[in-house]
């Protein structure tokens, strides 16, 4: 029996977000705690706790987040368990899984995305 290593195949979303972000949490990294910052963040690994960013968060297909999220924009292709508050937009990509409430003025849910929770798009708080 021979072993042939498989190379990682990244979707166009994953290639684009990895190139755009200043900070990437790799697929073998696990963080338990609070993350805060002023720049974009890509999560390919696992984050538990709380995430607070002034810019955008990208959760790639391999990413697992068990945290409340507060940021400007969120794009999710992986799994998120926790409440999401975005000042601009939340986008759930095909095959993502999200469990928690979403509060944002704009929300996009792709065909094939899984979402369980409540949505609040209250325009008064913009």
From Swiss-Prot:
Keywords (A to Z) from UniProt: Chromosome partition, Cytoplasm, Cytoskeleton
Highest taxon in the source lineage: Bacteria
Keyword set includes Cytoplasm: yes
GO-annotated cellular components: cytoplasm; cytoskeleton
Null allele phenotype: BacP, ParA and ParB-parS are less organized forming smaller, more dispersed patches, PadC still forms foci which are mislocalized. In a triple bacN-bacO-bacP deletion ParA, ParB-parS and PadC are also mislocalized, nucleoids are more compact, DNA origin regions are mislocalized, DNA content increases. The triple bacNOP deletion is synthetically lethal with smc or double scpAB deletions.
BP GO annotations: chromosome segregation
UniProt cross-references to InterPro entries, sorted A to Z: BacA/B
Quaternary structure and interacting proteins, as annotated: Interacts with BacN and probably also BacP, the 3 proteins colocalize as an extended structure. Interacts with PadC.
Full protein name: Bactofilin BacO
Organism: Myxococcus xanthus (strain DK1622)
Lineage, top ranks: Bacteria, Pseudomonadati, Myxococcota, Myxococcia, Myxococcales
Gene name for this UniProt entry: bacO
């Amino acid at each position: 029996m021979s072993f042939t290593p498989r190379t990682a195949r990244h979707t166009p979303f994953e290639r684009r977000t990895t190139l755009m972000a200043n900070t990437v949490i790799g697929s073998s990294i696990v963080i338990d705690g609070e993350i805060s910052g002023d720049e974009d963040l890509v999560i390919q690994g696992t984050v538990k706790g709380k995430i607070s960013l002034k810019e955008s968060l990208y959760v790639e297909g391999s990413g697992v987040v068990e945290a409340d999220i507060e940021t400007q924009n969120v794009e999710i292709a992986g799994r998120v368990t926790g409440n999401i508050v975005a000042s601009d937009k939340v986008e759930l990509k095909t095959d993502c899984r999200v469990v928690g409430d979403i509060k944002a003025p704009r929300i996009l849910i792709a065909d094939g995305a899984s979402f369980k929770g409540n949505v609040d798009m209250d325009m008064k708080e913009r």
